[in-house]
């Protein structure tokens, strides 16, 4: 029996998050940069300030193309989550770049995942 030699990467997307770290967005930036081999279509990050305000930056392109010093400075806070995208479903465009930021009557939240949300339409219309 011949051994199977597979020399291709089979990694899709990357998620990085930190809690309780000063300048969390900067650490998340470097985390996303180190995960960039997992997705190069786009990236994004959401930070949470001490007051609970959420801010997001996202865009198409490499991590170094999407973020700059001014954008990172706007992401003040000690919590952040980021995502690099490699699409397996859905189209391109900024609207599909994570993290997603939701404003709900129960509170705001950000979500980044590595997979497909198959019931997104149902969840979108949930009361």
What does each model-found stretch correspond to?
Residues 1-121, 126:
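N-terminal glutamine amidotransferase
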């Amino acid at each position: 029996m011949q051994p199977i030699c597979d020399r291709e990467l089979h990694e899709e997307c990357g998620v990085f998050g930190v809690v309780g770290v000063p300048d969390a967005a900067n650490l998340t930036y470097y985390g996303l940069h180190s995960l960039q081999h997992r997705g190069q279509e786009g990236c994004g990050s959401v930070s949470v300030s001490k007051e609970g305000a959420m801010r997001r930056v996202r865009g198409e392109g490499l991590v170094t193309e999407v973020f700059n010093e001014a954008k990172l400075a706007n992401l003040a806070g000690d919590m952040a989550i980021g995502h690099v995208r490699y699409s397996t479903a859905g189209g391109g465009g900024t609207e599909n770049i994570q993290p997603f930021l939701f404003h709900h009557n129960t509170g705001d939240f950000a979500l980044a995942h590595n997979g497909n949300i198959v019931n997104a339409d149902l969840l979108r219309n949930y009361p």
